[in-house]
Amino acid sequence: MALVLDTRFLIAHTFPPSGEDRERIARFAAKVLREERLVIPSVVAVEYIRVAGRRLGRVAAVARLNLWLNSGAELAPLSREIAVKAGELSLGRPDVPLADAIIAAVALSLRAKVVSDDPHFDALGIKRVWYE
């Protein structure tokens, strides 16, 4: 099964809210890296570098993203099919951010769950998992 990583997960992995969360996230990440096909939508890469880069700096944020990619996660480009599906999803849910619609479209194209605690995915009919 494929899992699509959301920006919220990558940020939680980089900046765990607590020591306990750090341990749970590390166990979860090790498990999914071994057992699952991991996909990072290109929009997640953009958001991650923007958010993490403000705290770590650009070079460190890109390096951390590359750790995921060099460990086997795939970067999913914004294809024509994904763009059209994301547009269709966002037509019905104007309250959902465009980035979440793109991430949802990637998940749908792969029949995958999204690793996120963001309820916007529920509104789009996307199943989610979280590290807890």
Task: For each feature predicted by the language model, list its residue ranges.
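Acidic active-site catalytic centers that drive phospho-/nucleotidyl reactions
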Residues: 6, 100, 118
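A generic "structured core" feature
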Residues: 23-40, 48, 53, 84, ...
